[in-house]
Regions:
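Canonical Rossmann dinucleotide-binding motif of NAD(H)/NADP(H)-dependent dehydrogenases/reductases
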Residues: 3-36
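The beta1-alpha1 cofactor-binding region of Rossmann-like NAD(H)/NADP(H)-dependent oxidoreductases
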Residues: 50, 54, 71-84, 114
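Active-site helix of classical SDR
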Residues: 132, 174
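Residue(s) in the substrate-gating loop at a strand-loop-helix junction
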Residues: 158
Length: 317
C-alpha cells in the first residue's frame, strides 16, 4: 500500500467512534501522526468518557502509528484552540484538519426547544468554525513567515443540509452552513496554501441508528447484505485522498460518499430565469404564472429517499 501521508500531522474531531474513528485509523495507516479528539459524549451531546479517544489512540499505536488523545469540546472556542495546539505541541505542526464531530437532537420544528437548536448548531457549525479558525491562524502565520504551507481541511456536511430532511431543521441548517463555510474559507485560504473541501457521508453510525431509530432497521439490514455499502470504513479513503498532496488544486468542493459511490455536489445555482420586456419592476399579481412556469422548467430535486433506495440497490447488488 502506498502511504500518502508520510510526515503529515492530522487532527480529527469526534474521532472516538464511527466515521471519525475510521478516518483517524486510515490517516495513521497512511503515515500521519494523529490527534484523536473526542470527549466521549452521547449522541445527543451529554456526558464525557475519555476512554473513547484513548482506545483509538491505543489501536493506532498497536499498528505502529503515532497518536495522542484530546478530550476538549469543539464548541468551546478555547477548547478548540487546545485541540489544534495539541498537534503543534506534540508533533510540531498541523497539516490536516478533519472536522467530523457531531451530535443529533432530532425534533419537528414545533417540538424543538431552544437548547436543541443551540447545541446542535454549536457542535456542528460553531465547532467547525472554531477548529478551522485556530488552524488557519497557524497556517497564515507560517505562510507570512515564509515557511511552506500545504494545509488540508476536510469538513463534514450532510444530505440533511444539502437536500433537507424532516425532523432535522437544526442539524440540516448546521450542515448547510458548513457547506457554504467550506466554499468561502477555500477562497480565503487559497493564497496561503490551504485547501478546504467537505464530504457528505452516509454510513452506519450511532447517529444513524441510535439517534434515528426509523433508519436503524434499514441500516442494519445492509450490514448483512452481500456488500456492506454503509460500513463507516468506506468513508475514510476519500478523506485520506483529500488530505494528501495528490489532491492539490482541489478546493471548495463538496463530495457525497456512500460505500463505493462518490458524487460531486453542485450546490445552489440558477435553473430558470425570466426578465420583463420593459424596464420596470414586477407587479405582485403577474408573478403567479411566471413563478409557476419557472418551477416547471427546473430539474427535479434529489431526495434523501432516492439516495437511500440507490444505496439499498447497491448493497443487494
Amino acid at each position: 500500500m502506498a502511504r500518502l501521508l508520510e510526515g503529515k500531522v492530522a487532527v480529527v474531531t469526534g474521532a472516538g467512534r464511527g466515521i471519525g474513528r475510521e478516518e483517524a485509523i486510515m490517516l495513521a495507516q497512511h503515515g500521519a501522526k494523529v490527534v484523536v479528539n473526542d470527549p466521549g459524549v452521547s449522541f445527543s451531546g451529554e456526558g464525557k468518557e475519555t476512554r473513547v479517544a484513548d482506545e483509538v489512540v491505543e489501536e493506532i499505536k498497536k499498528m505502529g502509528g503515532e497518536a495522542v488523545a484530546n478530550y476538549d469540546f469543539v464548541d468551546d472556542f478555547e477548547g478548540a484552540k487546545r485541540i489544534i495546539q495539541t498537534a503543534i505541541d506534540t508533533f510540531g505542526k498541523i497539516d490536516i484538519l478533519v472536522n467530523n464531530a457531531g451530535i443529533l437532537r432530532d425534533k419537528m420544528i414545533f417540538n424543538m426547544q431552544e437548547e436543541d437548536w443551540d447545541k446542535v448548531i454549536a457542535v456542528h457549525l460553531k465547532g467547525t468554525f472554531n477548529c478551522t479558525h485556530h488552524a488557519c491562524v497557524w497556517w497564515r502565520n507560517q505562510a507570512k513567515a515564509g515557511k511552506p504551507v500545504s494545509g488540508r481541511i476536510i469538513n463534514t456536511t450532510s444530505d440533511a443540509g444539502l437536500l433537507g430532511n424532516i425532523g432535522q431543521s437544526n442539524y440540516g441548517a448546521a450542515k448547510a452552513g458548513i457547506a457554504a463555510f467550506t466554499i468561502i474559507v477555500a477562497e480565503e485560504m487559497a493564497k496561503y496554501g490551504v485547501t478546504v473541501n467537505a464530504i457528505a457521508p452516509v454510513a452506519r453510525t450511532r447517529l444513524t441508528t441510535e439517534a434515528t431509530p426509523q433508519l436503524a432497521a434499514i441500516f442494519e439490514s445492509v450490514a448483512n447484505a452481500p456488500f456492506d455499502v454503509l460500513n463507516p470504513k468506506s468513508i475514510a479513503p476519500l478523506v485520506v485522498y483529500l488530505a494528501s498532496d495528490k489532491s492539490a488544486g482541489i478546493t471548495g468542493q463538496v463530495f457525497r460518499i456512500v460505500g463505493n459511490m462518490i458524487w460531486l455536489m453542485g450546490g445552489w445555482r440558477s435553473v430558470s430565469k425570466r426578465k420583463k420586456d420593459k424596464k420596470e419592476y414586477w407587479e405582485p399579481e403577474e408573478l403567479d404564472s411566471v413563478i409557476r412556469e419557472m418551477l416547471k422548467e427546473a430539474p427535479p430535486k434529489e431526495s434523501m429517499m432516492e439516495i437511500m433506495q440507490e444505496v439499498l440497490k447497491e448493497a443487494q447488488g
